[in-house]
Amino acid sequence: FLAKKVAKTVAKQAAKQGAKYIANKQTE
């Protein structure tokens, strides 16, 4: 089902953003 694929993609992007956010927090 398409929704599952979209959810997976969104989760992947969220993980990427989260990692970036954490990295930024640690470098402060």
UniProtKB/Swiss-Prot annotation:
Subcellular locations according to the entry: Secreted
Glutamic acid 1-amide: residues bearing it: 28
Superkingdom of the source species: Eukaryota
GO MF annotation terms: toxin activity
Organs and tissues of expression: Expressed by the venom gland.
GO cellular component: extracellular region
Presence of keyword Chloroplast: no
Pfam families linked: Cu
Protein name as annotated: Short cationic peptide-1c
Organism field: Cupiennius salei
